[in-house]
């Protein structure tokens, strides 16, 4: 249930008002391998399973079969200098199961960047291999410069 109040009725037409709850949902990549019809959301702590289901069905028109929620404990960390312990906020995760016919795949926005990075890694590996061949050639004469070869 939202904590915001629905606007008061006012006489006359049109009734221009929109009720926006203070709920939020964030689509996240799952940490473990999941079936293609299961989608993981990070939701606000106040949301229940029924709120998640209604949110997706009414606003986004998604057919929802099942909703499971859990509260993931925030990460604790010890400060290296002073030794005090800090803890990140807990997060509520919702696992939404869609019908078997539907599947969700994260879009690959950075495929061009991955190709470019692979190309750069290939050229770096080639230069490393060339340098290694140079070192192997001069193994028997340590300390001599490269121009001093036969």
Curated annotation (Swiss-Prot):
Gene3D superfamilies: 3.30.70.330. GO terms for molecular function: structural constituent of ribosome. GO terms for biological process: mitochondrial translation. Keywords: Mitochondrion, Ribonucleoprotein, Ribosomal protein. Belongs to the universal ribosomal protein uL23 family. It comes from the Eukaryota. This is Large ribosomal subunit protein uL23m. It comes from Drosophila melanogaster (Fruit fly). Pfam families: Ribosomal_L23. InterPro entries: Nucleotide-bd_a/b_plait_sf, Ribosomal_uL23-like, Ribosomal_uL23/eL15/eS24_sf. It is found in: Mitochondrion. GO terms for cellular component: mitochondrial large ribosomal subunit. Component of the mitochondrial ribosome large subunit (39S) which comprises a 16S rRNA and about 50 distinct proteins.
């Amino acid at each position: 249930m939202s904590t915001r109040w629905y606007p008061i009725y006012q006489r006359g037409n049109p009734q221009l008002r929109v009720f926006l709850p203070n709920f939020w949902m964030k689509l996240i990549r799952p940490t473990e391998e999941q079936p293609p019809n299961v989608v993981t959301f990070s939701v606000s702590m106040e949301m229940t399973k029924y709120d998640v289901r209604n949110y997706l069905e009414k606003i986004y028109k998604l057919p929802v079969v099942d909703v499971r929620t859990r509260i993931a404990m925030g990460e604790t960390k010890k400060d290296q200098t002073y030794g005090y312990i800090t803890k990140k906020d807990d997060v509520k995760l919702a696992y939404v199961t869609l019908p078997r016919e539907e599947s969700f795949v994260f879009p690959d926005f950075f495929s061009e960047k991955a190709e470019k990075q692979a190309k750069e890694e290939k050229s770096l590996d080639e230069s490393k291999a060339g340098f290694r061949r140079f070192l192997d050639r001069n193994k028997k004469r340590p300390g001599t410069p490269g121009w001093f070869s036969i």
